[in-house]
Structures are given as C-alpha cells and as structure tokens.
Amino acid sequence: MILQLLVPVDGALPGPVLTEIAALYSTNHAFFELSGDFPDPDRITVEQVAASLADELAHDGAEILLARSAGRLVGLAATLDRNPAAAPGDDDPWIGLLLIDATAHREGYGRAVATLVEDRFRAAGRTGVQIAVLDNNPKGLAFWQSQGYSPVRRAKDRELGRDCTVLRKPLDTA
C-alpha cells in the first residue's frame, strides 16, 4: 500500500482522481448519515466532494493522502499539521478524516492507512497524533481505541458543533 499526496493542479483537483474519490465517498453512505456532512448520503456528487476537499485543503498545514493498493483507491486520510483551535502547547497533528472504501471494510486497510499516516508524522519528529470521533460513531471510537488511541477530552467538532471524543496516541520516535 502507498500513500499519495493529493495535489491540486492550477487550483483544481484532477477530474479523474476526483471521480475516484467521489466513488470512495459514495460507498460510505452509512458514515455520512452519522456525520451529516452531505445533504443526501445516498447521492453524494463529485461537486460536493470537490467542495468538501477544497474546504479541508483551505486550512494551513492540511493534506489529503490517497491510499492505493495494487493501483486501486482504497482509502483517504485528511490530516492537519496542527489543530487551529488547539490550546497553547498542544502541537500535535490531527487526522481529520480516515475513510476506507466500505466494500473493503474489515480487510485491514484502515489499520494500514492509520499506521502509514502515523509513520509520516513520526518521521517528521512529531510525538503524538490526535483525532476527534463523533459521539454517534461507536464503531469509529472502537477502531481508534484498538489502534492505541486514548480519550483525552470531550469537545465539539469545528465544522458543525457535533459532540466528539478527542483521542490521542503517543508516537514513539525510537
């Protein structure tokens, strides 16, 4: 598996890649029903995905990483170099979204992508990583806790003010 950085071309996302990403999002209608990120999770459009990705990339230090296995797009991670709403001294990077093709759930891709993202942060000298999991997503919370993330506080997400649990994982650098 490899991670590829999604790079806009002339300020826009490449059409074929955007179509692939929209297909990935469309497989995850159950997650998007929970999150409320799209008006109709059963009909997510390329234009909606483009707008969502543009919103993610508008933040300083944001990256979209595409996960490919044997050339197939199996997942996506949106990361932030630092949470813009973090308290002073909280310099951990964030995983804003980890999305795996729903037709490939329970095949180890989520764990593999999370590990690759953590490895990128570790290689950059980061000592921890955080994620906020929506309270109405117990499967997501269980996944992240199984990856070694521990709850550190309660919060509201920055987009829609939804209740979340913030988790953190220390990254060993040795």
List each model region and its residues.
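Acetyl-CoA-dependent GNAT
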Residues: 2-105, 114-116, 120, 170-172
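Glycine-rich phosphate-binding loop
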Residues: 108
